Amino acid sequence: MKTAAELRQLVTRIDHRSYPAYKDTKGMYQFPGYLLSIDHVQGDPFASPSRVSIQVKGKIAGFPEQLYQTKWQKTALEDALIRQFGQCCEKFGFKAKGSGKSGMISISRCGQEVLERSAAQIDEKTGDIHIRLEVGFPANGRTINAREWIRIFFEFLPECVEKALYYKNCDAKRLQKISDLAEDQQALRDILPKLGLCAFVANGSILPRESGVSARPMKSAVCFQSPEEMEVEITLPHRGVIRGMGIRKGITLIVGGGYHGKSTLLKALELGVYNHIAGDGREYVITDSTAVKLRAEDGRSIKKTDISMFINDLPNGKDTTHFYTEDASGSTSQAANVVEAMEAKAGVMLIDEDTSATNFMIRDELMQRVIHRDMEPITPFIERIRELYEEEGISTVIVAGSSGAYFHIADCIVQMDRYMPKDITQTAKKEAEQFPQLSGPKEKAKKPDFARKPQQGREWKGNDRIKMKTLGKEAISINRETIDLRYVEQITDSEQVTALGYCVKYAQRHLLDGTRTLQEVVAMLEKKIEKESLAALCESTSSVASLARPRTQEIFACFDRYRGLKL
């Protein structure tokens, strides 16, 4: 291992040379208080920035063990360190001058959710901190600018390390509050099933967001207040007693007029699978961590999914136990989404009437009279929803504004009235008695077959040059094959999409051999991440990308939408 002084001498020696000479700097260097590793050097000042990592020994960093002794506290502290380091990076970003991306210093940009990321890792045994960031190596045109490079690595980065990664220079009370909040959120998440709940929304929560492009809380928004009938009281380790609306397991219907807050509540519930930072307004909006938001998804591909519990006897004679299409309709796509959520072991399904296929959700009495059941291949969701709960233990939360069909079967009916919830179960049930209940299914559905066994694609055999590109939160391109993730609505960060791409790449290279089911493949990916870290998906220390951990359910969703998957 070389010293910082040797690195300075090396860069001074290659000053004014052609830009590729920067590649000589690749390696590890001991700086006072930390280890610097230059993992990947960009080939051009206009290319993606160089990848750099910093390691600080636990004894030097000095963060108390109680701040990272549990998994969720560790993730919360890592998130806080990324935010602190990022603030320092912003202070120095582009202060070093030059062409292209010269002087750029960046680290993962965290949102309102607290996610496990490759940008910061703490060793729970030693307290060692590992930070990954990107730096644009300075250039004049396409020649090396050593003076500006030295400013970045010998002035700017040492100050960032000292201010953000040494406990003695951090706000100790703030970090303790972050740790306590993480512990409270996990305690609340753990207690939900014991209370028979699938979700909880604390009184005083701020659910509306600032705008369609901002996830920050809306100013002057109406604070959430639970209906008295649904209010539960929970004691947390640090916050103490907290009260709010408990959504019980079973079938919950959210109704109300337009613009009264139905979809806003559902949106908060769908993102309640993640913990949120202090001040977000949704810190204590907690949902079963396996909950999945479902919708119709016209045009998506379906790969040998067993949708026979909803769709049978198609006029074209297609086998719905191994249904395949490259262009699904609204109803078939939503049927597949439900079955795939079951395959991913979802405990709760979240559905909004606005984004659902009507013929999949309901079939009214008049339509049943005109078009006989024997002529309709679709068994609507309303006829399976009770069975899903009683046989599979899957709860459902549905938002409806135009159809009262679900009044008959809902266990709880909540009306949103000017952003405030009301329990109208008894009133709605009484009114529903005046309307005939639609007939149920002829027989119980056969449990879907989850025996799909993906194989390695031909183009992956012996090919180490597969290219991948993340397209924001909406899609990822692998070997020119685009995986469309626009409607996987619980993806909250583009770095999760990048991680999903690496999941596919790793699986294609090591796991897809035609002998393992998709469930087994995903379980093996999860085990690798849990045991070795998120960065292990990249398989090379020189190519660790900025990754955020997706849930199991999103990993399944990515494979399900991968048109290049061979089954």
Regions found by a protein language model. Give the residues of each.
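N-terminal accessory targeting/assembly segments
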Residues: 1-196, 207, 567
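Flexible beta-alpha connector loops of hexameric P-loop NTPases
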Residues: 145, 300, 310-331, 363-378
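Carboxylate/His-rich catalytic cores and anion/metal-binding grooves
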Residues: 193-197, 203, 259, 266-297, ...
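N-terminal pre-Walker A segment at the start of P-loop NTPase domains
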Residues: 208-243, 278, 286-302, 307-318
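Glycine-rich phosphate-binding P-loop
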Residues: 242-274
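Conserved alpha-helical scaffold flanking the Walker A/P-loop in AAA+ ATPase domains
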Residues: 329-341
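Conserved P-loop NTPase nucleotide-binding/switch module
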Residues: 341-385, 389-390, 402-408, 412-429
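Conserved NTP phosphate-binding and transfer environment spanning the P-loop NTPase/kinase superfamily
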Residues: 390-393, 399-567
